[in-house]
Every structure is written in structure tokens, then in C-alpha cells.
Amino acid sequence: MTTSRHLLLALLLAIFSLVVYSNFEADKPASAPLDIKQIAQGLQQPWALAFLPDGKMLVTEKPGRMRIIDAEGHLSAPLAGVPKVSYKGQGGLLDVVLDPRFAETRRIYFSYSESRGDDANGTTVAYAELAQDRLENLKIIFRQQPAMKSDKHFGSRLAFAPDGNLFITVGERYVGMQQAQTLDNDLGKVVRVTREGDIPPGNPFSGRKDARPELWSYGHRNPQGAAINPWSKKLWTHEHGPQGGDEINIPQAGRNYGWPIITYGEQYGGGKIGEGLSHKAGMEQPVHYWVPSIAPSGMAFYNATRFPAWQGNLFVGSLKFGKLVRLQLKGDKVESEQRFDIGRRVRDVRVGPDGYLYLLTDESNGQILRVGPR
């Protein structure tokens, strides 16, 4: 009799688990229809896209080129004045954003992996003035410290806050994962600086002798998505987990986001990371996470009027599955997820001035795709 009860209980638990799992997966169909139009092609590993006031697009290519592309898809010659990058592994010319005061300054801000000698390199951020066919008056405003002998996990996304300060995401460079938990370096951190690279008031560790003053939050792995929520005005980021455990976070001043102490992922090939914890006191939980990994890259909040059904949604690119991921939000929570099949590695996601989404595909013949609901 006891054995029968145990078997019945096990069967009921298995059925319940299957139902819960199925309901969760129902929010994540393998594909859904989109109208997809190719705008441009012939880009080598494009990494980031920014819209200029005239509607043209400024695009970075990882080998170290920056181009201007018009609405018909015509590619300019590479702009002169781009600094030399360390094009190796995951490194190269990476993110680009416009100065919030671009109309008066003509400044663009961009990130790249910079050689530091002795086979070391680091995430570097600079600004320059955009002339017709070149960058002028370049100034470096941030250099990741310390430099590392690694070609992985540069992070490198940039986002301007409403107060004009600049958030920079920095990966832990893979070989420095334990340093994501210490405050005397920039590895595995979100950094906050002024437009000139100075330390703004309100940085949580400013004035501490054991911490770098530019730090905003810590315990990150490799954040390759960053955007300001236009409704809450908060910074949102996403980061790559190891094998599983990609995360979306809302980094707050001075908070610890756990890597590599807590994670929903595991070692490549299987096995615990550290003690195998996913929760620990004093460490923040993600807003959303993915197991298995989707390899997120690029993110954009939809705050345009062309497609009302998308209003208030967050869109994230997927390198691993060739998807565009739509997240429906309620406040600071993710309520549901939908996946659109793009068929290519999606490196960046931006909302265009026309209300369409624009995607960059990560490939040797990279494309700009314009997408909307069908």
C-alpha cells in the first residue's frame, strides 16, 4: 500500500512538472512570422548600429572599420581616423552611440579592444567628432584596468543615462572571473563616467581606497546588451552566462550580481561552477534568465508608435539560435517571451526613427535587416 502511494505521488508530480514546463515553453514558440527586409549587406562582422539625425546609419565592423549607410543600403568607404583595434577572438571595434548633444557637438562614443603591449589588451572607450568622411579630435575617456591576456569577454556596450552620464559594461575577460567580485579593478563591472570620462557625483564606491571610483555595479560575466528603459529611466543589461544562465539585470548602484559565486549556468561540458549556487545573501537575482543559453547580444526597448502591439516590449538578439526575442514587460518584470526566427546570428537590435526594428547579423557578409510584425 505504501509503495502504491509513493508511485502515485511520483506520477502526479511528474505530470505536474510536465504541465508547468509545457506552459512555460508555450510562451516561447520556436518561430513566429515577421516581415523582414534586407537593407544592406557586405559588412564584415558588424557589431553595432546607431542612427544619425538624417536617418542614415553608423555601423561598426569588428575588424576596425566604421561606415555610414543610407536608407537604400549604400555603404560608404570606411571612415578615416578610427583607432587601431586588437582584432582577435571576441575583440575588435565594438559598440557605438551618439552623444545626447550630437546636434551641437557632432560627437560619437565607441568602444573597442585596445592592445596594451605584451600580448595584453583591454576594453577602451573613446569619443570623436564625426566629419563627412572621418573621425576627428579623438579622446579616450575610459580604459579597462588591468589589461588582460585574453581575447574574450570584453562586454563593451554603452548607454547614456538621462542625466548625461555614460554607462559602460565590461566583461570579466574570462581569465579574470574571480576579479568580478573585487572592487580594485574594472573586470565584470558596469562603469559610470561623465561625457568627458570623469567620475560623476553619486558613484557608490567613490572615495573608497579599496575600490575604483568609476564602478557602478559588480559581479557580472560578459554583458553585451545595455539600454535605458524609457519609462523607468533605469539601466537594463543582459549578459552571457556560461553553459546556460544568460541573465537580464537592472544594475543598481553598489549592488553585487553574483558572478561567479551564483549562476544558473554550469561549466562548459557540464559540472558545477564553484559551489553550484544560484542564490546567496547579498547577491542580486536576475530579472530574467535563460537555460539553455540563447547567447544574447544587443537590446532595445520599443517606444515607437508604428506597431502599437509592441509598445513597451523589450527586444533582444540571439547569437546562438538566430532569433529575435520579444519580452513583454510589466514594470520591472518579464511576463512572457516570444521568439522570432531570423535564421542568422543577431548581434545588435535598434529601433529606427521610422518605428521599425533594425538588426545586425554577425557574419562575414553581415546584413542590416529591417523587421516588423506581419
Predicted regions and their residues:
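Bacterial N-terminal signal peptides that target proteins for export
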Residues: M1-L8
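Hydrophobic helical h-region of N-terminal Sec-dependent signal peptides
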Residues: L9-S17
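Acidic, Gly/Ser/Thr-rich repeat motifs that build Ca2+-stabilized beta-propeller blades
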Residues: F16, V20-G176, G225-I228, K233-G241, ...
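Surface-exposed loop and turn segments in beta-propeller and other repeat-based domains
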Residues: A77-G91, L138-F154, R195-W216, P260-V291
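Beta-propeller blade signature
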Residues: T123-D133, T182-E196, I250-Q252
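Internal hydrophobic scaffold segments of catalytic domains
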Residues: A180, W231-Y264
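Loop-centered beta-sheet repeat module
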Residues: D184-V193, G202-L235
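Conserved blade-ending motifs and adjacent loop-strand segments that build the rim/top face
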Residues: H220, K333-P353
